[in-house]
Regions:
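C-terminal structural segments of small proteins and small subunits
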Residues: 74-95, 100
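Short S/T/G/P-rich N-terminal loop/turn motif that feeds into the first structured element of a domain
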Residues: 1-68, 72-79, 105-107
Length: 107
């Protein structure tokens, strides 16, 4: 008997920037696309700026850029965390991060 396949891992990251200008937000989105796409095991990738028109009471407005990467397995996610491009992204971009919130969940 085979064991059931592990569920995908959803890695959602919300960045609040020190420089919250449109230029800085766009630069982070571009860096996400440059360094964080096409990693082994990625089944979905998306990044973008906060949808400013949404001001409902339930909307969290304390972030500037969102990143969502879905990995086929937890092992794929764990390899991504150690990948040179991921580490380079952090090294180049973290100086402008006021806060980073990460939400990992099963898909």
């Amino acid at each position: 008997m085979t064991s059931p396949a592990s569920p995908p891992l959803i890695h959602a990251v919300f960045f609040t920037l020190k420089d919250r200008s449109a230029r800085a937000r766009d630069a982070l989105v571009a860096a996400c696309r440059k360094y964080l796409t096409d990693h082994p095991g990625t089944v979905h990738f998306s990044t973008g700026t906060r949808a400013e028109p949404y001001e409902r009471p339930v909307n969290d407005r304390e972030f500037d850029v969102a990143l969502v990467v879905v990995f086929a397995t937890q092992a794929d996610h764990d390899q991504y965390q150690q990948a040179p491009r991921h580490k380079q992204f952090i090294a180049e971009q973290s100086g402008n991060w006021a806060q980073v919130r990460v939400f990992d969940s099963w898909g």
